[in-house]
């Protein structure tokens, strides 16, 4: 289990919010004992990814081995890019191609379930990281995680978050997310999950046109609990107005050199269980 970072953990600003949750979670044994059985027993066809993160390379492998035989989930999202892990002092696995290769390949040999690698928005050589994750056996990529930044409370000159810095999410992250999806689309045939500022049907369409096979919504639900259902309704209306009958028709495909997108129909629809 992880207690996570000191409060306050969330701070709002005009462009979205900062969070510094610190990967707080119930831990492996409680997840096996309580969380996954509930999903198995209460959701008809669970399309859930378990998000895992380790302080060390070996911890990723321990989590995969500990969860792989359990029911109630589809696959793993390998969080290589959380900027709020105090024990790693902001050092991201996603910015080290050799670490990405070691973690993805090690997880791959330990499970036959789908593996989704979650990458960083501030990677100076994202195309290389994408290629490494692809070569080592990832089935899809999540782009992007939050972007490290800070907010200051000027009434007492201290950071607004208990941990000091945090990660940007919401509309302010959207340009970074779109850029990353576009870059990754040119570097791999894998399906891409677009993340960052998906607030409405319009932003979902933007991610699809950039190359995202699916999108994730998180911060939007903090602002408006019905954001997801309204976005779905908005997509249906958008499709009618623009004579588009299927989401796949919107998704920008990779260049011919990378062949067609490797379709994973198991991922439609899908939910991610875990904090960025």
Q: Each PLM stretch: what is its role?
A:
Residues 75, 79-84, 140-150, 197-198, ...:
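Glycine-rich phosphate-binding active-site loops on the catalytic face of alpha/beta enzymes
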Residues 48-52, 76-78, 115-117, 141-143, ...:
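Hydrophobic faces of well-ordered beta-strands that scaffold small-molecule active sites
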Residues 1-46:
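Glycine-rich, positively charged N-terminal anion/phosphate-binding segment
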Residues 4-14, 152-166, 208, 220-248:
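C-terminal helical cap(s) of enzyme catalytic domains, especially alpha/beta-barrels
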Residues 26-45, 95-117, 161-192, 231-247:
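Alpha-helix-loop-beta-strand connector modules within alpha/beta enzyme cores
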Residues 17, 83-98, 129-190:
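Glycine/Thr-rich beta-alpha phosphate-binding loop at enzyme active sites
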Residues 58-70, 123-136, 185-188, 198-217:
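Catalytic cores of alpha/beta
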Residues 51-54, 119-124, 174, 190-202:
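Glycine-rich beta-to-alpha transition loops that act as phosphate-gripper elements at the mouths
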């Amino acid at each position: 289990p992880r207690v996570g970072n000191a409060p306050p953990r969330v701070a709002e600003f005009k462009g979205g919010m900062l969070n510094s949750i610190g990967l707080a979670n119930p831990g492996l044994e409680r997840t096996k004992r309580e969380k996954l059985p509930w999903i198995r027993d209460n959701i008809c066809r669970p399309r859930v990814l378990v998000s895992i993160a380790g302080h060390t390379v070996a911890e990723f492998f321990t989590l995969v081995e500990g969860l792989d035989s359990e029911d109630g989930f589809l696959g793993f999202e390998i969080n290589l890019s959380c900027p709020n892990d105090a024990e790693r002092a902001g050092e991201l696995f996603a910015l080290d191609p050799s670490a990405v290769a070691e973690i993805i390949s090690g997880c791959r040999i330990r499970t036959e379930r789908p593996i989704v690698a979650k990458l960083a928005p501030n990677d100076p050589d994202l195309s290389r990281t994408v290629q490494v994750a692809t070569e080592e056996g990832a089935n899809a990529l999540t782009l992007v995680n939050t972007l490290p930044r800070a907010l200051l409370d000027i009434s007492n000159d201290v950071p607004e978050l208990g941990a000091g810095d945090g990660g940007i999410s919401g509309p302010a992250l959207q340009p970074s997310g779109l850029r990353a999806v576009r870059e990754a689309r040119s570097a791999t045939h894998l399906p891409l999950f677009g993340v960052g500022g998906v607030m409405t049907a319009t932003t979902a369409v933007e991610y699809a046109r950039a190359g995202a096979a699916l999108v994730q919504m998180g911060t939007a639900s903090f602002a408006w609990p019905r954001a997801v259902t309204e976005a779905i309704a908005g997509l249906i209306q958008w499709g009618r107005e623009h004579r588009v009958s299927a989401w796949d028709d919107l998704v920008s495909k990779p260049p011919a050199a990378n062949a067609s997108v490797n379709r994973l129909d198991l991922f439609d629809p899908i939910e991610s269980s875990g904090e960025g």
